[in-house]
From Swiss-Prot:
The keyword Transferase applies. The lineage of its organism: Archaea, Methanobacteriati, Methanobacteriota, Methanomada group, Methanococci. This is tRNA (pseudouridine(54)-N(1))-methyltransferase. S-adenosyl-L-methionine binds at L130, G157, L180, S181, P182, L183, E184, L185, C190. GO terms for cellular component: cytoplasm. Keywords: Cytoplasm, Methyltransferase, S-adenosyl-L-methionine, Transferase, tRNA processing. One of its GO terms (biological process) is tRNA methylation. Its EC number is 2.1.1.257. It comes from Methanococcus aeolicus (strain ATCC BAA-1280 / DSM 17508 / OCM 812 / Nankai-3). The keyword Nucleus does not apply. InterPro entries: Alpha/beta_knot_MTases, TrmY, tRNA_m1G_MTases_N. CDD domains: TrmY-like. Pfam families: Methyltrn_RNA_2 (PF04013).
Amino acid sequence: MIEFIFKANKSITNGEINLKDLPGSSGRMDLVCRCVSSAFFLSHDLRRDTIFYSVHYGAPNPPVAIKFVGSELKRVSPDERSIALFIKKALDKSPMQLWKESTSGIYIAKKEFKDIILEKKNEGKEIYYLHKDGEDIENIFNKENNAENKNIVFILGDHIGIGEEDEKFLEDIGALKVSLSPLELHANHCITIVHNALDKAKLK
């Protein structure tokens, strides 16, 4: 199972999403939608071995976490508007501490970014923080240490990043920094590159 945990610093936390202005009044909700599309959609199929979390810290009720489970998703299309509609449906619900299903494969909860990461750590999963100063991903996932049958979690942030406090938290729990490029990349592009690296590692 491959999991991504994405920190959306400005994305709103209620259902008042303006589908005509996802980057603006919706708090860069376009970034969340692009990440969902990159996490799951193949040309004619879905990645069913993937889970994606988006943790929103925008107004008015942060934090709110949304979970997308690839093996359960139905009726979602890869375009931003379709994904935003499903996010809107989730955010229209009142989030509780426990995950509550909004539509097939999409859940909402009142959870912190750190809390979700810590849950994964306590489950024994390997935590990787996507950062340009980390170790090259192809050195980590190769013939000797491939991704098959592993439970792997990747942490990434939006255009703002995850912040110094969360970086320190990741360091404290032993997360390994992984680099995809010496350049700063868009989060959705990072997800595509990660999938590609893991796909190749599984075939070696």
